[in-house]
Amino acid sequence: MSKFSKFFLMCATLMTTSVLMAQQPGGKEIYIPRDLQSNDFNNPESKWSYDRMATTENFVVFWEKGFGKDLSKAPKLEGHNMTVDLPNLLDRLESFYSFYKNDLKFVLPGSKSERYRMMVMLNYSLEGTAYGGDYDRQIGALWIAPNRVQDKKLNCIAHELGHSFQSQVSCDGQGEAWGGSGFFEMTSQWMLWNVNPEWTTDENYHWQDFKKKFHNAFLHGTNIYHSPYVLEYWSMKRGL
């Protein structure tokens, strides 16, 4: 390869890198997961795009093309409301993050979350589920649909973000904090209860079911969403 060709290739690489970096806001980095490496984030027509993105200090939220650029004006899907109150979502996410980090200590100094923003992927879908986990053992993430983020308190997000923080423990090499036991669901319910003391009223059916099933063993599968009370007792006895 001639010196001119090498110089041209180097310039092209630098230009491409500068375009990609220009889309990244200041502050923490946006991690690009392995399974999204082929997605062109600079293209508004892509499934995920910097054109449909919002950031806070600790989060990046991407939403699919079907929503359009303005989540408050998203078109209906099969007659269902798909709008999302983005300011409320961002505010709640930051509030939950602060408590899980600073009060519950789910992340410690040196965490990868100090480098990367946690990721929220909003799907233009009627699927009524939400998931919390991580990308590539690097950074906590959420995968959600509009019907799980259309209430003001966002109890579902508080629960699922709990799973993201549980996963972050493993991402940071601090131990294994996810999988294989109902204890992780109990923990997310307890985390939710801590950020919303009215949880037992908002989702009173969990309390009613627990009263009917409290005779089951501590980690019995029937109670994993109903019984954060042991964790609350431990925190009262030992402190957070």
Across the structure, where does each feature detected by a protein language model lie?
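Generic recognition of stable, solvent-exposed alpha-helical segments in well-folded globular domains
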Residues: 160, 226-229
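Catalytic micro-motifs at enzyme active sites that drive phosphoryl/nucleotidyl and oxygen chemistry
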Residues: 48-50, 109, 131-132, 220
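Post-HExxH zinc-binding segment in Zn-dependent metallohydrolases
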Residues: 177-221, 228, 233
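Juxtacatalytic substrate-recognition/specificity segment
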Residues: 55-180, 187-188, 198-199
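Bacterial Sec-dependent N-terminal signal peptides
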Residues: 1-24
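N-terminal low-structure segments adjacent to metalloprotease catalytic domains
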Residues: 3, 21-56
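Alpha-helix C-terminal capping/termination sites
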Residues: 236-237
